[in-house]
Amino acid sequence: MMGGKAALLLALVAVTLAVVEIQADAGYGYGGGYPTPTPKPPAKGPKPEKPPTKGHGHKPEKPPKEHKPTPPTYTPSPKPTPPPATPKPTPPTYTPSPKPKSPVYPPPPKASTPPTYTPSPKPPATKPPTYPTPKPPATKPPTPPVYTPSPKPPVTKPPTPKPTPPVYTPNPKPPVTKPPTHTPSPKPPTSKPTPPVYTPSPKPPKPSPPTYTPTPKPPATKPPTSTPTHPKPTPHTPYPQAHPPTYKPAPKPSPPAPTPPTYTPPVSHTPSSPPPPPPPPYY
């Protein structure tokens, strides 16, 4: 059993070491798997100011070219090498201690003839002399003093009056009333009701369609221009005052009334359907 446990522990240690190595290669451990930093471009300096021109048509003098220093090449710092994984101490293999072997005793040689046992002669039994043990003188223990308690004064309690129990008077029972005897009501004689006689209501007489009488056409005479067909109503006379006004406005001439249009009824109509009514006169 102990050897099997040691083998299981060794297998677990080997598996954990393999997992740690895989994580370090994948980038989860010390510095592995991170991208290399890209080198930053060098910072540009300020632009040189242009010199003022001499005049119209003259080219400005070019300043001598400055030799720009070559930017230093960026060398990425070397990655710190991860410290080697400290190997876990292998547990000591348990070697069971050898059990002590029981000594093998050679079998005793078989005796051909068993030796005859001769019991040794017992010495005569001599009883030791019994001496009477002297008893010590009986000493009585001293009697303890008898404790007499001091007499307590008698406690006099006032007599508590016992409450008289209430006399139970039972509630008077109501008198037992017998239920009224049910007398069945007399049934009316079974007679079927006579159904009402249906009398149809009299229908109102249908109204006859009105006969169309065409209105007589007035003679086509033009009204005179001087006399209006509809005289204007007389203007309202003001109420009498203390000093009536002297100025009276002249009556305005009424405009000539337009001639009413002549109505020509349609010719094609059936005698059964009445013709449409004439339009109202136009004033």
Swiss-Prot record:
Biological function: Structural component in primary cell wall.
Extent of Basic and acidic residues compositional bias: 46-69
Subcellular location field: Secreted, Primary cell wall
Main location class: secreted
Cleavable signal peptide: 1-24
Keywords: Cell wall, Cell wall biogenesis/degradation, Glycoprotein, Hydroxylation, Repeat, Secreted, Signal
Protein's UniProt name: Extensin
A GO cellular component annotation in the UniProt record: primary cell wall
Post-translational modification: Hydroxylated on proline residues in the S-P-P-P-P repeat.
Bias (Pro residues): 36-45, 70-264, 272-283
Keyword Signal tagged: yes
UniProt key word Chaperone: no
Renumbered residue ranges of the record's region Disordered: 27-283
Source organism of this protein record: Sorghum bicolor (Sorghum)
GO biological process assignments: cell wall organization
